[in-house]
Structure formats: structure tokens, C-alpha cells
Amino acid sequence: MLLLPLPLLLFFLCSRAEAGEIIGGTECKPHSRPYMAYLEIVTSNGPSKSCGGFLIRRNFVLTAVHCAGRSITVTLGAHNITEKEDTWQKLEVIKQFRHPKYNTSTLHHDIMLLKLKEKASLTLAVGTLPFPSQFNFVPPGRMCRVAGWGRTGVLKPGSDTLQEVKLRLMDPQACSHFRYFDHNLQLCVGNPRKTKSAFKGDSGGPLLCAGVAQGIVSYGRLDAKPPAVFTRISHYRPWINKILQAN
């Protein structure tokens, strides 16, 4: 199987494409996911792309490192990204903390912290999301949710409105076709018997399990068939804490 680096995933999402779409999901109730962040990214080559992310502190957003770029603007409080509302807060990213061990071949350590130029104002439409402790190892079989503005089908454009889908955490064996899948660093998400998945455009968004962000959308198959691979947040809690404490 051909696996593509995550930057391409944002345009292909899942064989190894960056996961960026919600396939088989439904539209979220407006502003029911106040932690969601929409990232507009200018790449080093000039073209722009988009990713998801989520607010963990008033001045920090957590996302995937394959969403890094020359510059990033974060929109909080959005539901329809084409219709500006009073709830919107557009904030500039002043520093991108990319995980130092990120590997574009294995796609391990696909996690990044974004420091915002200004602190977000917490409102009914903008809020923070809890993330797990280092030793919180979420078990297979758990039903979780992922949200994003990504494609709703392999050949379809990105969604204007925030979409959400329920996905099951799978045993590591379900992701054995991904050559570099590592259960200690990553989560295998999505029942292969179902059509529901995250796809291009959802990259960087959170996997929410019992109210806690356990994973970050990373990559999957080019045809968007589940399961997909998510970064396991609990493994990176010490790294996250170190950056938050120093900034």
C-alpha cells in the first residue's frame, strides 16, 4: 500500500493521506464544540491549506505537526467557515512548537502546539478542551467522536459547516496494514466494516472520548476507508506540559 506524507493527506486524506474529512457523519449543532479551531495555513511554497485543531489553553491550540506552515491564522467560535459571525475570534499564531522527533517517513510524533498572539476570550462559543494525563491509556472498543470541516466524501470538497462522526477505537491489529503504526504513540480508530471515517481537512482535530481529547487526526488511507491513525495524546503529555510551563 502506498502511504503518503501527512501534508498530502490534507488534500487526499486517508491511504496514507492526511486525515481531513468527516465521512458518514452529521452536522454539529452550532457552537456545541466550542474548543474547535479552524486553521488557515500558508505553506512554505505559497499555497494555502486548512486543518483542524483545538483550544487547550486560552493562548494555545493543539494540532498535528503536518499542519505546520509559514504562517497560521486560527479561527475560534466558528460553525460555518464561510459565514462570519459575532462569535468568531481570528487570532494569529506567533510560534509553532513542532514535535522535535516528527518523522515524515513514519509519521510518528505528529503533534504540534500553536501559541496565539493574544489570549482567546472564553465565551459560550469558545472554550478549552481537557486532554489526558500521561498514564491515561484509553482502551480499544471505546466509542469516541471526531469533528472537522474536512471533506464529506473522497471526491467531495470540504464542508462549510462543522461535521461530527462517532468512531470506535480498534485493536492495534486493525491498523497492521499501516507499516509504521505504533500502538504506544498512536490510536487505531474506525471500524473497517463501517464507512464512517475522518478524511482530508479534518487533520489536527481532536478525538473526543468521554469529554477528553485522547487523539489527534493524523493519517489514513487514500480511499478514506477506516480505520485511520490518530496521534495518542497521553504519550506526549510531558512534552506538552514542558512547553506550556515555559510559555
Curated annotation (Swiss-Prot):
Superkingdom assignment: Eukaryota
Example GO BP: proteolysis
Alphabetical list of InterPro entries matching this protein: Peptidase_S1_PA (IPR009003), Peptidase_S1_PA_chymotrypsin (IPR043504), Peptidase_S1A (IPR001314), Trypsin_dom (IPR001254), TRYPSIN_SER (IPR033116)
Main location: secreted
Pfam families: Trypsin (PF00089)
Protease keyword on record: yes
Disulfide bond sites: 51-67, 144-209, 175-188
Subcellular location: Secreted; Cytoplasmic granule
SMART domains with a match to the protein in the record: Tryp_SPc
Gene Ontology, cellular component aspect: cytoplasm; extracellular space; intracellular membrane-bounded organelle
Enzyme class: hydrolase
Alphabetized UniProt keyword annotations: Disulfide bond, Glycoprotein, Hydrolase, Protease, Secreted, Serine protease, Signal, Zymogen
Residues cleaved off as propeptide: 20-21
Residue runs in coiled coils: none
Signal peptide bounds: 1-19
Protein name (database record): Chymase
Organism per entry: Macaca fascicularis
Biological classification of the source: Eukaryota, Metazoa, Chordata, Craniata, Vertebrata
